[in-house]
Amino acid sequence: MDKHKDRIESMRLILQVMQLFGLWPWSLKSEEEWTFTGFVKRNYRFLLHLPITFTFIGLMWLEAFISSNLEQAGQVLYMSITEMALVVKILSIWHYRTEAWRLMYELQHAPDYQLHNQEEVDFWRREQRFFKWFFYIYILISLGVVYSGCTGVLFLEGYELPFAYYVPFEWQNERRYWFAYGYDMAGMTLTCISNITLDTLGCYFLFHISLLYRLLGLRLRETKNMKNDTIFGQQLRAIFIMHQRIRSLTLTCQRIVSPYILSQIILSALIICFSGYRLQHVGIRDNPGQFISMLQFVSVMILQIYLPCYYGNEITVYANQLTNEVYHTNWLECRPPIRKLLNAYMEHLKKPVTIRAGNFFAVGLPIFVKTINNAYSFLALLLNVSN
């Protein structure tokens, strides 16, 4: 399997893009070299994100703070809060970059997770292909939010920026407008690509581990027709060892993705709230480009909350299904030592497997529903206050 098929096929292109945008190590070995190339690879992320990403986000927040009223602040808050979640994601992946790189390397190369037969290969390729194309579409839709907003303002009579931020010079004239517009477009492109690729990375870790739990279920099911107790016992022991290692991977994954999921869920209710508030003040006739961009933005934000909740829920569901798979084995015809082994495994399975965000709550579909309800409550309160 490893010689001609890639176990992380769906992430190969995404990781290359993340390297170009300073979000993923080129390699741990090359960055440790005390050469000019090693220095550039170590510090490239700072050279890219300090003058653009962090400066741009700071100017957005400055624009929100100096706004004269709630309506003007709402035009920038929906995006500046989104970018605040991005800051947490970037700092988190920089902090855990070595651990994340080693986790990805283990998922790709560790012999413990090799696929054994063509059925497993077909299953793996099918799921990887679906993940890849789904997230390619998600990335294109997210970039569409940026470029529909950037295009829409070009058809307005006056000078208007697609995404408001504080500009330290007079920009509402023909000569200087394009400087402000260009920095706006560059900043939004960089932050958008950074945001969606980091989302994809976090979701991929969750997705890959859920696939490993599904793989365990498939292998337990295959033991149903085994008649030889010796082979059956060997297969069970291999499954138990693999399960223990997957649990260890789950904890590593939780440590890496927990900060970004926590920040995303906490801030998402406010983001959707201010996005809905802005939609109330953007007319489709007056500014159709901005209106369509806002609709896309709200849909992407809902998807951005839903995806980690969905994949976190998948881990819990497929880990819990292993109990049912044990009952489907040929345990009634096994010798007493094998039954004792299965009983010990069943006791091990009683401990639930969940991904927790900062040890506050389990990442799953219930927290997604609560976040949407909170966003609606905040929006209703904001509309009442503004009226």
From Swiss-Prot:
Residues 67-75, 155-191, 277-290, 384-387 are extracellular. It is a multi-pass membrane protein. Keywords: Cell membrane, Glycoprotein, Membrane, Olfaction, Receptor, Sensory transduction, Transducer, Transmembrane, Transmembrane helix. One of its GO terms (cellular component) is dendrite membrane. The keyword Lipid metabolism does not apply. Glycans are attached at residue 384. GO terms for biological process: detection of chemical stimulus involved in sensory perception of smell; signal transduction. InterPro entries: 7tm6_olfct_rcpt. The atypical heteromeric and topological design of the odorant receptors appears to be an insect-specific solution for odor recognition, making the OR/Orco complex an attractive target for the development of highly selective insect repellents to disrupt olfactory-mediated host-seeking behaviors of insect disease vectors. Odor-evoked OR currents are independent of known G-protein-coupled second messenger pathways. This is Odorant receptor 94a. It comes from Drosophila melanogaster (Fruit fly). The lineage of its organism: Eukaryota, Metazoa, Ecdysozoa, Arthropoda, Hexapoda. The gene is Or94a.
